[in-house]
């Protein structure tokens, strides 16, 4: 029997239409998630999220907030997933449990393009095994041993700020802080500092690269194959479609080659004059040397696995802490009362303006601690929702039965602006921590910038040491004024690219050193 091309196309089109219709009917009527409230269009198709995240540039997170106001604290946000905004805040610790088995959802984890890394690992037990190998490098004791390296980078940052005193030259502090955190994490990861603090302009291209990598998650969540496909394409073609991804791939290659040098036993950079790298004073205690000495199987010590781990360590280690430093700097400089109170505490603790801070002294300052906690709350960590799956237990929330295996997400943005837990939540108020009867310990339960549970951000100790030492040093030594910086444009979360971004029109939080 002979069929014309038009007949074949009609049959294929009809089959596709029947499949899509059946899929939509199943999702809306027969799927176990069909009982949960929420918009039907979003429950039927992922294209709704695609529209708000890709076309509207990172707006789906805000749409979720609107839906919660309309439908209540538990909603279905796509065909696979429910989202919870708990008015009491306590269910977060059930979803992000430290004792229960918690997988990641494959669809959500795929956005990172690093399935062999700790961040991208789906299975709970495999994640624990991989995490155990990294834990020693990020323990508090290990980070304390790293403080000479951290301190050397802070001193270099301050020397750059010293050069700018009295020049009336505005500085984008997000760039400067990103140079600081990058030089710290690259020294620790590879024993090779990338020396961004030496760049006269504070490496705006590097900061742009981090943003481009963050933006890419909007696409890779929807199309997991996209990143690997782009890697195999000619660079000219990649540049035609997305010039920013060339910067991301350059960094991936740089990380790949530096890890290869570690695998091949090379401790020093052979030609630092050509690649801008320098050896750091921690030759045998880098993160990747420790991974190679761990009990991970040989497969997890290959360049394929370690390269993915390196991408996540550098990206997370550089961007999230610099954002917190930037948010805190803005709120201090825009609030003379809070700034004055902090400076008084710093001056009492360190009479010598140019003295070197002891970590224990800095960590023991209550108001500085409150400033940091409040800054972390308003910087959010990840602006996007985080998703967990309880594969072995059914859960219950507010009378709703949640079948085991259901992807459940929650978002730091909504936890941190829960007015019941944090009254006047949009106000920068360190006293909510320092004046609490228990010193703010009860509020710590609801501060989820690093998430919670067995998959909590592994870099929490490093981030906090960087925050304490950097803020204590910079605000003890320098007098600054904001320059052409507007909260709504330059600080407020406007785009969720997994990590928070301000308005596209922002020139950054800029300051002038007096």
Curated annotation (Swiss-Prot):
This enzyme's EC code(s): 1.14.14.-
Needed co-factor(s): heme
Chain ranges passing through the membrane: 6-26
Matching InterPro entries: Cyt_P450 (IPR001128), Cyt_P450_CS (IPR017972), Cyt_P450_E_grp-I (IPR002401), Cyt_P450_sf (IPR036396), Cytochrome_P450_monoxygenase (IPR050121)
Gene Ontology CC terms: membrane
Reactions listed under catalytic activity: polyporic acid + reduced [NADPH--hemoprotein reductase] + O2 = ascocorynin + oxidized [NADPH--hemoprotein reductase] + H2O + H(+)
Pathway per the UniProt entry: Secondary metabolite biosynthesis
Gene Ontology MF terms in the entry: heme binding; iron ion binding; monooxygenase activity; oxidoreductase activity, acting on paired donors, with incorporation or reduction of molecular oxygen
Coiled coil (residue ranges): none
Topological type in the membrane: Single-pass membrane protein
Family annotation (Pfam families): p450 (PF00067)
Compartments, record wording: Membrane
Annotated binding of heme, by residue: 457
Enzyme class: oxidoreductase
Disulfide bonds: none
Keyword annotations: Heme, Iron, Membrane, Metal-binding, Monooxygenase, Oxidoreductase, Transmembrane, Transmembrane helix
Biological function: Cytochrome P450 monooxygenase that hydroxylates polyporic acid produced by the nonribosomal peptide synthetase acyN to produce the less toxic metabolite ascocorynin. The hydrophobic substrate polyporic acid might approach the active site from the membrane and, after hydroxylation into ascocorynin, leaves into the cytoplasm. MO6277 appears vital to avoid high-level accumulation of polyporic acid in the fungal membrane.
Family, per entry: Belongs to the cytochrome P450 family.
Protein's UniProt name: Cytochrome P450 monooxygenase MO6277
Organism, as annotated: Ascocoryne sarcoides
Lineage: Eukaryota, Fungi, Dikarya, Ascomycota, Pezizomycotina
